[in-house]
Swiss-Prot record:
Pfam families attached to this UniProt entry: His_biosynth
Entry-linked InterPro entries: Aldolase_TIM, His_biosynth, HisA_bact_arch, Isoase_HisA-like, Isoase_HisA-like_bact, RibuloseP-bd_barrel
Top-level taxon of the source organism: Bacteria
GO molecular function, a single term: 1-(5-phosphoribosyl)-5-[(5-phosphoribosylamino)methylideneamino]imidazole-4-carboxamide isomerase activity
Gene name in the database record: hisA
Organism: Burkholderia cenocepacia (strain HI2424)
GO biological process: L-histidine biosynthetic process; L-tryptophan biosynthetic process
Keyword Transmembrane helix: no
Enzyme class: isomerase
Name of the protein: 1-(5-phosphoribosyl)-5-[(5-phosphoribosylamino)methylideneamino] imidazole-4-carboxamide isomerase
HAMAP family for the chain: HisA
Amino acid sequence: MLLIPAIDLKDGQCVRLKQGDMDQATIFSEDPAAMARKWVDLGARRLHLVDLNGAFAGKPKNLEAIEAILDEVGDEIPVQLGGGIRSLETIEKYLDAGLSYVIIGTAAVKNPGFLQDACTAFSGSIIVGLDAKDGKVATDGWSKLTGHEVIDLAKKFEDYGVESIVYTDIGRDGMLQGINIDATVKLAQAVGIPVIASGGLSNLPDIESLCEVEEHGVEGVICGRAIYSGDLDFAAAQKRADELNGELDNA
């Protein structure tokens, strides 16, 4: 089970939003590269970056901070990024800079042809981000709810060749209410590619619950507010996940 620390970037700083609201941002660090180093030193095996300004602007807005993070840890672990990725040129720029994966969210839902082109051009590097509330997909930084069922879109995107899916339960993100395990497993069982859970991770029991369903295709979980607020000790959580994986593998 991959525990993936999130570094959300707003105006060059590492922040956390409450339910996607740019006006409800808590600044956790003015040095995102130092934050990346901290998580890697604590045992992170992948990082999840979000360009929040980019997500709302539709184009890269935190390049300097992203490049600083890649300079710091990009040679050591894979780094993935979402937010504002709307063109093949942007993807190419990011991958050339050292990102391992780019996450396409709103653009995948609104313009499936773009996602298909991206999967063809950058095979193995494209992750789809599906944000949902009550099983329905949301777009545009969560401000718009669509009529699309998450599972239907996930199957379609799997056929395009996406590497994996980051699934966020909007109702729980940044609220420390616990991961929506049932919805995540349902999605993972419906597709043959890995699913990364996101939204609401709050404590060690959440990690333990996710490890129990890893066999269904839940590859990892994005750790956000809980590791910044201190509700979850990242190093202890990764250690526990590794212990559980060992126990399950030996069972």
